[in-house]
Amino acid sequence: MSGSPVKRQRMESALDQLKQFTTVVADTGDFNAIDEYKPQDATTNPSLILAAAQMPAYQELVEEAIAYGKKLGGPQEEQIKNAIDKLFVLFGAEILKKIPGRVSTEVDARLSFDKDAMVARAKRLIELYKEAGISKDRILIKLSSTWEGIQAGKELEEQHGIHCNMTLLFSFAQAVACAEAGVTLISPFVGRILDWHVANTDKKSYEPQEDPGVKSVTKIYNYYKKFGYKTIVMGASFRNTGEIKALAGCDFLTISPKLLGELLKDNTKLAPVLSIKAAQTSDLGKIHLDEKAFRWLHSEDQMAVEKLSDGIRKFAADAIKLERMLTERMFSAENGK
């Protein structure tokens, strides 16, 4: 009998090992794909909701959102907006039935440079969750990590007790500003940073530890832990399991079902790479960023400037596609009469 736990441990999947020192989050709108991996939390974005909303399995939710938009009435544009907010919340509510933790729901990326509009939309999403019987403690509102988005996050946290997840984070400047704003969680991207370096430099492949996305998250994690910031660091946007393993020990990692599946089948030994203890010995100095300093430092990072604007454009394009899809479903019959 005494040998069995050792044997069991030897066969433990990389996913189960990872869960021992990092909170694992599922990055998907397809909530039927969540069960197998037993994540703590889940994240969604406009692109993931758009993909899920086109699956046959989720048409009832789409119909419910459409009915809600129509019931509230008003101009066509208003009905669509209400239907989309409702759809995001319906997906979030279903996801919450399958996880013990929190779900992240994103504010429309087209509001990324309008602080007040982001605050208003976030409050509306929380209101819709409340109508569905879900406490704001189980929701993270995702906002773009523009200066305006970060200030919206600060206001939502301080004045409304709404927890925020700052997304599309590519630069150290963005991470520092988020820490100073006191938001609940940040999502520094890994894979999209790698994509940029592969596309814009001569180097086309990287070992995980040398991956520029991995190095970015490592630096941010070390900075937060060295200076005692409470904001959770959640690495996001992975291209392979090597990147994930190289960030083992990070507070949270949000991972697609495809890569969660690969980790589940992988039995290689995993050890934490990031740690609070190691962060204390890093040579990072503390900095303060007001708006001018933030804009300057962020603009110095060509990759981050390009990937932030590219990310906003992509999420905005998918929001528009979702609007068109709902417009067609809601009004094409009426318009055809």
Curated annotation (Swiss-Prot):
Query: What coarse category fits the chief subcellular location reported for this protein?
Result: nucleus
Quote any Pfam family the record assigns: TAL_FSA
Reply yes or no: does the keyword Secreted apply: no
- The answer to keyword Transmembrane helix applying to this record is no
Q: What class of enzyme is it?
A: transferase
> What keywords tag this UniProt record?
Acetylation, Cytoplasm, Nucleus, Pentose shunt, Phosphoprotein, Schiff base, Transferase
Q: Name one GO biological process term.
A: pentose-phosphate shunt, non-oxidative branch
* Entries under Gene3D superfamilies matching the protein: Aldolase class I
* Domain remark text: The first 10 amino acids are essential for nuclear localization.
Q: How does it assemble?
A: Homodimer. Interacts with KPNA1 and KPNA4.
Q: Which family does it belong to?
A: Belongs to the transaldolase family. Type 1 subfamily.
Q: What is this protein called?
A: Transaldolase
Q: Which organism is it from?
A: Cricetulus griseus
